[in-house]
Swiss-Prot record:
It comes from Paracidovorax citrulli (strain AAC00-1) (Acidovorax citrulli). The keyword Kinase does not apply. PANTHER family: LARGE RIBOSOMAL SUBUNIT PROTEIN UL30M, MITOCHONDRIAL RIBOSOMAL PROTEIN L30. The gene is rpmD. It comes from the Bacteria. Part of the 50S ribosomal subunit. GO terms for cellular component: cytosolic large ribosomal subunit. This is Large ribosomal subunit protein uL30.
Length: 60
């Protein structure tokens, strides 16, 4: 049985004033309010989403 690798991300900047696609990416990662933390499966799809909004989030 393999264990899933996870990645924790925290929203550190407000998505107000950003592109609509970036706001949708923030919501897609499960982040809502400022400083909210989400733990997700570490996959290429999630890594791409994090890379897209790297200026808004911090990887913990």
């Amino acid at each position: 049985m393999t264990t899933q690798q996870t990645v924790k991300i925290q929203l550190v900047r407000s998505p107000i004033g950003t592109k609509e696609s970036h706001r949708a990416t923030v919501r897609g990662l499960g982040l809502r309010k400022l400083n909210s933390v989400s733990e997700l499966k570490d996959s290429p799809e999630v890594r791409g989403m994090i890379n897209k909004i790297s200026y808004l989030v911090k990887v913990l």
